[in-house]
């Protein structure tokens, strides 16, 4: 009876009774006395040549012998590598001074890209990186090139009940052709709604940068399952509607820090959207920081926003194309006892010199007792009373302000174009980057009320270093 046919691509199965014999053969092979590589190589050649010669005249039999030899060599190499990794893991465990729980805590503080790089270093780090706590604060902004919807879903599900913050998209964008289209859109947030919104309810901070196209329905659906969110930042909004603010009013009343930035030509905020925005601020009792960049706010809307939130300490309305500053004097009369400490009005093309001067005088008379910082810096100066003219050297009573209100920092820098000095929209580094990249193409002329092109501004290509260390988010460590 012929023996059963064996696949030429597999190693012959050794019966259980022969395991010890096989182990002895392999042990004998591994204990081969030291010799020169050339001598060992020649020995292999001789033995293999004899085995092929004595096997059969049939080439297929010889082919199977060669394939089997190659597979044995491959298995030996794989086994050696596994042993090496085990030894390295034991070494790391003995030499790594932090206990696993503290290592997990450190990993949870890294951005997601850095954590994944650490995870592929060794088995010990990989095990630590699989803990849910490591995904409490998901930051994929440093790996936007690779982070598609599937990656986001995997990360959110890994975090599970430990999910606390989520940052997605590209922080910095540049003008020009879109050479690397973003992989994410508003629909990437759909995993937050799974299991009746359980994951979304765990979220405390959500920051989205330039997700396009972003559908308001998808965004509002995601926000509707995040009732405990306290920090919301969305950069790259377009066509502001009351739908977004209505959703925030109904579902996200615990927000303490709200940051919204639009792109494209900022139009005057529509009445419905403005009313919905004021309603949200009015019904958000914990709101202490409000940033609305490039919003087409009128002075009336700006005053209503400041008056509607009594706990507001930080207000940033930079790059508004419509604010003239009249709301400042009105605010001084109606909000003498409010808590506002910081007011930022950078790069507002219609902000008038006379209104800022009136504001300074209001400070000197004792209004705005809580104010500590004001910034009205602009790359193009302030609007002068003479129509069409700009003022780069306004006559503000700064010396008197320093003497009588030494607790106030008043910033009013208006660099000339030739100086090359540019001012951002906020104190935070990431927003200074945005301003630096967009300042050349995004300054709005005072007399220009025509619609600008609505072509999307492309995202900046990531550094080529992103390709290092296998940061395509290896599937072995994501699934």
Swiss-Prot record:
Subcellular location: Nucleus
UniProt keyword Nucleus present: yes
Protein name: F-box protein SKIP17
Organism from which the protein derives: Arabidopsis thaliana (Mouse-ear cress)
Chief location category: nucleus
Alphabetical keyword list: Nucleus, Ubl conjugation pathway
KW GTP-binding (keyword) present: no
Database matches in Pfam families: F-box-like
Membrane-spanning intervals of the chain: none
Oligomeric form and interacting partners: Part of a SCF (ASK-cullin-F-box) protein ligase complex. Interacts with SPK1B/ASK2.
Source superkingdom: Eukaryota
One of the protein's GO biological processes: protein ubiquitination
């Amino acid at each position: 009876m012929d023996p059963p046919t064996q696949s030429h691509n597999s190693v012959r199965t050794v019966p259980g009774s022969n395991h010890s014999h096989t182990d002895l053969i392999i042990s004998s092979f591994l204990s081969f006395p030291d010799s020169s590589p050339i001598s060992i190589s020649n020995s292999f050649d001789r033995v293999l040549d004899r085995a092929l010669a004595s096997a059969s005249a049939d080439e297929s039999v010889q082919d199977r012998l060669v394939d089997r030899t190659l597979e044995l060599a491959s298995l030996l190499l794989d086994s050696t590598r596994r042993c090496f990794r085990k030894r390295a893991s034991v070494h790391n465990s003995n030499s790594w001074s932090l206990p696993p729980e503290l290592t997990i805590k450190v990993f949870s503080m890294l951005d997601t890209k850095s954590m994944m790089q650490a995870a592929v270093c060794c088995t010990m780090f990989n095990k630590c990186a699989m803990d849910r706590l490591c995904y409490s604060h998901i930051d994929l902004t440093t790996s936007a090139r690779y982070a598609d919807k599937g990656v986001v879903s995997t990360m959110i599900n890994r975090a599970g009940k430990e999910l606390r913050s989520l940052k997605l998209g590209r922080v910095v964008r540049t003008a020009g052709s879109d050479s690397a289209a973003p992989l994410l859109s508003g629909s990437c947030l759909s995993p937050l709604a799974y299991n009746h919104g359980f994951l979304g309810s765990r979220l405390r901070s959500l920051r989205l940068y330039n997700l396009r196209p972003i559908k308001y329905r998808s965004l509002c659906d995601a926000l509707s399952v995040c009732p405990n969110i306290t920090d919301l930042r969305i950069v790259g909004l377009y066509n502001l509607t009351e739908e977004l603010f209505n959703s925030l009013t109904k579902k996200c009343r615990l927000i303490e820090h709200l940051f919204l930035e639009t792109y494209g030509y900022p139009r005057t905020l529509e009445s419905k959207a403005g009313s919905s925005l004021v309603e949200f601020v009015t019904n958000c009792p914990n709101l202490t920081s409000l940033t609305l960049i490039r919003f087409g706010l009128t002075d009336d809307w700006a005053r209503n926003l400041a008056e509607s939130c009594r706990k507001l300490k930080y207000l940033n309305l930079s790059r508004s194309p419509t604010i003239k500053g009249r709301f400042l004097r009105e605010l001084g009369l109606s909000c003498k006892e409010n808590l506002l400490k910081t007011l930022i009005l950078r790069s507002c093309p219609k902000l008038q010199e006379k209104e800022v001067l009136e504001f300074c005088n209001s400070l000197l008379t004792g209004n705005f007792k809580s104010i500590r910082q004001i910034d009205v810096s602009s790359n193009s100066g302030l609007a002068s009373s003479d129509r069409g003219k700009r003022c780069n050297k306004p006559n503000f009573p700064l010396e008197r302000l320093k003497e009588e209100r030494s607790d106030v920092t008043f910033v009013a820098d208006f660099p000339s174009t030739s100086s090359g000095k540019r001012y951002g929209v906020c104190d935070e580094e990431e927003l200074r980057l945005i301003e630096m990249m967009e300042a050349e193409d995004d300054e709005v002329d005072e007399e220009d009320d025509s619609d600008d092109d609505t072509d999307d501004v492309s995202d900046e290509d990531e550094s080529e270093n992103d390709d290092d260390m296998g940061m395509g988010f290896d599937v072995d460590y994501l699934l």
